[in-house]
């Protein structure tokens, strides 16, 4: 199977997206993967937040995704979604996640850069690493804490 980076490069070249959906149960994972395959998507990314990873277990999430990938013969990639610490990212990398999003958005810019570099150095070339600077509006947590104008 091709790497996540090859699918993302192809998606960018062809101006389409690779969907990303979080899951916390095997049933939800199956629905996501089967739906993406039936819709003709080239691949799909599934993720666990820190809370979902704690509930499900990181090694269990990796095993579920690997089994789904093999059963469906369809590229399903697992993302550690908005993990807040190096330690949690390290655990996800060691467990076998395909990609991690280290969310240092509550840190200052320089501290955030240091954190992202620390995770990338640990991950090497085996796991894709994404960093977040600032915050993205739209998360339910952000909507509860930040007043959003309807204008």
Language-model segments: which ranges?
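N-terminal amphipathic alpha-helix/helix-capping segment at the start of soluble metabolic enzymes
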Residues: 1-19, 66
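N-terminal glycine-rich phosphate/pyrophosphate-binding loops that anchor nucleotide-derived ligands
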Residues: 20-37
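Hydrophobic faces of well-ordered beta-strands that scaffold small-molecule active sites
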Residues: 17-22, 44-48, 76-81, 100-102, ...
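Active-site beta-loop-alpha junctions enriched in small/polar residues
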Residues: 24-26, 47-51, 81-85, 105-107, ...
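Glycine-enriched alpha-helix->loop->beta-strand junction motifs that scaffold or abut catalytic
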Residues: 40-41, 94-100, 125
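Active-site-adjacent beta->alpha loops and helix N-cap segments on the catalytic face
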Residues: 27-30, 54-62, 82-91, 104-128
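Glycine-rich tight-turn/loop motif centered on a GG-T
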Residues: 46, 51-56, 98-115, 141-151
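Active-site cofactor/substrate anionic-group-binding motifs, chiefly glycine-
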Residues: 38-93
């Amino acid at each position: 199977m091709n790497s996540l980076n090859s699918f993302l490069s192809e998606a960018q070249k062809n101006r389409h997206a690779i969907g990303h959906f979080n899951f916390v149960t095997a049933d939800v994972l199956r629905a996501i993967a089967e739906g993406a395959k039936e819709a003709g998507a080239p691949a799909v990314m599934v993720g666990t937040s820190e809370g979902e990873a704690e509930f499900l277990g990181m090694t269990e999430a990796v095993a579920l995704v690997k089994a789904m990938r093999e059963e469906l013969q369809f590229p399903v990639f697992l993302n550690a979604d908005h993990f807040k610490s190096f330690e949690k990212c390290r655990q996800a990398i060691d467990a076998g996640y395909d990609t991690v999003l280290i969310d240092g958005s509550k840190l200052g810019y320089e501290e955030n850069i240091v954190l992202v570099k620390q995770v990338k150095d640990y991950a090497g070339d085996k796991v894709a690493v994404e960093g977040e600077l600032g915050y993205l509006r739209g998360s339910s947590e952000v909507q509860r804490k930040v007043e959003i104008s309807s204008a």
